[in-house]
Amino acid sequence: MDQLQIKDLEMFAYHGLFPSEKELGQKFVVSAILSYDMTKAATDLDLTASVHYGELCQQWTTWFQETSEDLIETVAYKLVERTFEFYPLVQEMKLELKKPWAPVHLSLDTCSVTIHRRKQRAFIALGSNMGDKQANLKQAIDKLRARGIHILKESSVLATEPWGGVEQDSFANQVVEVETWLPAQDLLETLLAIESELGRVREVHWGPRLIDLDLLFVEDQILYTDDLILPHPYIAERLFVLESLQEIAPHFIHPILKQPIRNLYDALKK
């Protein structure tokens, strides 16, 4: 992909763990590579399809100096986060933050951290069977947007019977396709935080819930950890999930089963 490179932007700020760093301040140096499609900007002279690197450098300087953080990891992360927020056309970003005056009392050129993130497509299943179900789904989607997660597509809301054998009210279910620069684990933690904010209490496994947010796919990632399994292990067994998926992404290929969603839906429906 096309790349914009900004190298060694110098800024003076008051980041650091030691009191002297927060009182006296020091120099920091930022370099970054931003990846996005430059075709439209290059061929049509369309400035809206480009990143104004002068304005970006000014924004970085302002953002960098408006707080005093203990760790340079925090500052670097915030620069990446806000760059993605202000420049939606950026698809990938690699940022290095150097701290040449780091108080290590030894001879060195610099200390630095590098953060590398890229946007990914993900699919999230939403469900609710308590209170105003459709309003709960809408609130969850609004909270995703508020966290900088771009909603690409929304399926219709389906009324479905509960899954898992626990007697309870019917569900309102939906699937959304999103674009986010958050890694899969961070995206999962975001979903859990939204559930908590909306009042979900985990008491009965597969029991009633005010809101349920399940991470189905993140691109074609295959992942197995104590906290997260990708793809979601029950996709091929849940007709309501497949029905919503095939509405918005019928040709998406399940990375383990190697079949498009449309085929999985047709097979389970029979």
From Swiss-Prot:
What is its pathway? Cofactor biosynthesis; tetrahydrofolate biosynthesis; 2-amino-4-hydroxy-6-hydroxymethyl-7,8-dihydropteridine diphosphate from 7,8-dihydroneopterin triphosphate: step 3/4; Cofactor biosynthesis; tetrahydrofolate biosynthesis; 2-amino-4-hydroxy-6-hydroxymethyl-7,8-dihydropteridine diphosphate from 7,8-dihydroneopterin triphosphate: step 4/4
The residues listed in the UniProt record as binding ATP, with positions renumbered to this chain, are 160-163, 171-173, 192-195, 200-215, 227-233, 238-240
**Any idea what this protein is called?**
Bifunctional folate synthesis protein
Q: Quote the record's binding site residues for Mg(2+) 1.
A: 212, 214
Reactions listed under catalytic activity: 7,8-dihydroneopterin = 6-hydroxymethyl-7,8-dihydropterin + glycolaldehyde; 6-hydroxymethyl-7,8-dihydropterin + ATP = (7,8-dihydropterin-6-yl)methyl diphosphate + AMP + H(+)
Purpose = Catalyzes two sequential steps of tetrahydrofolate biosynthesis, the conversion of 7,8-dihydroneopterin to 6-hydroxymethyl-7,8-dihydropterin diphosphate.
Tell me which InterPro entries the record gives: Dihydroneopterin_aldolase, FolB_dom, GTP-CH-I_C/QueF, Hppk, Hppk_sf
Q: Which CDD domains match?
A: DHNA_DHNTPE, HPPK
Task: Say which species the protein is native to.
Answer: Streptococcus pneumoniae serotype 4 (strain ATCC BAA-334 / TIGR4)
* Any matching Pfam family: FolB
Record text on subunit structure and interactions: Homotrimer or homotetramer.
Question: What family does this chain come from, according to its entry?
Answer: In the N-terminal section; belongs to the DHNA family.
